[in-house]
Amino acid sequence: MFEKSTWIRLPRNVVVGHGVLDDAVEVVRDTHLTGRPLVVTSPTPKTVAAENVVAQFEAVGDDPAVVVVEEATFNSVERVLGEAEAVDPGYLVGVGGGKAIDIAKLASDHLNVGFVSVPTAASHDGIVSGRGSVPEGDTRHSVSAAPPLAVIADTGVIADAPWELTTAGCADIISNYTAVKDWRLANRLQHVPYSEYAGALSQMTAEMLVDNAANIKPELEESAWVVVKALVSSGVAMSIADSSRPASGSEHLFSHQLDRIAPGKALHGHQVGVGSILAEYLHSGQEGQWMAVRDALASLDAPTTADELGVADDEVLAALTSAHEIRDRYTILGGGISEVAAREAASRTGVI
């Protein structure tokens, strides 16, 4: 008897384009969210976008509350929950980059209220997904949560964000290429459940960005449009799979371990981009697609070497040889690779 079932949670509204920030109230109304909004933001996004959103809610009498978080930590989540206890919000609105959106996402999931994502930078696929990433000490936790009910991505705002944040988002998407390879490998060798649809969507998104990398330029709304659509596709793939597998493989394990060994040296997206070069070499060898991955990253001004990441060669090798210890997730790294193998991969690809 067939007993398989799935529950796919997706955003109800994804609004992308020029000037859509001004439609915040209309988008929220269309999702049927009611009550007092609690806007979660951080210092720079507060000026860039959150004040606009707050003014819109004030204009219609929704009496928005605002909490400004400095960093993405569980303490920040607790702070938002404390504010929520005081104001009794009907829903949360995360305005900013990774910090504010992840904090709002986790807090709204805990409160069991709706959440609206308003990204001010295209720095990672968390703007749409049901995953939140929160560092704690030298460890970064990937936490499951409900995806946003709505996403409002203003390409004008995102195009004006620091270019390095956009290149980090691009690198995060490009790394889906090796994440899907790791997922398929885990399915073959460990019988890990695999979704053909989610895998194909994630791989197509990565390949699209690799093919168009040379056309993505700073301060162009057309470029912001392409990157945001790719981030949305990646987030949807994770929701379909009910797993981060479509967008997180050995390259993410490498990045998380690098966070422990050399904390604060580089952006997450840039680290997984370099990790993807290494992972593709490990998957396919010298004749694989690692050069295409590297060249796409380079055309975006994203790092492709340890030096460009700001980390030492030995730190890259240490992260690569111990990345399998991060979590119980089968990838091309298996139970770990030797330092000799790690050095060969990093040297052949020019990472070190």
Swiss-Prot record:
Substrate binds at residues 125, 172, 256. It catalyses: sn-glycerol 1-phosphate + NAD(+) = dihydroxyacetone phosphate + NADH + H(+); sn-glycerol 1-phosphate + NADP(+) = dihydroxyacetone phosphate + NADPH + H(+). SUPFAM superfamilies: Dehydroquinate synthase-like. NAD(+) binds at residues 98-102, 120-123, 129. One of its GO terms (molecular function) is glycerol-1-phosphate dehydrogenase (NAD+) activity. One of its GO terms (cellular component) is cytoplasm. InterPro entries: G1P_dehydrogenase_arc, G1PDH, Glycerol_DH. CDD domains: Gro1PDH (cd08173). Transmembrane segments: none annotated. Its main location: cytoplasm. Keywords: Cytoplasm, Lipid biosynthesis, Lipid metabolism, Metal-binding, NAD, NADP, Oxidoreductase, Phospholipid biosynthesis, Phospholipid metabolism, Zinc. Zn(2+) binds at residues 172, 252, 268. Its cofactor is Zn(2+). The keyword NAD applies. HAMAP family: G1P_dehydrogenase_A. Belongs to the glycerol-1-phosphate dehydrogenase family. This is Glycerol-1-phosphate dehydrogenase [NAD(P)+]. It comes from Halobacterium salinarum (strain ATCC 700922 / JCM 11081 / NRC-1) (Halobacterium halobium). The gene is egsA.
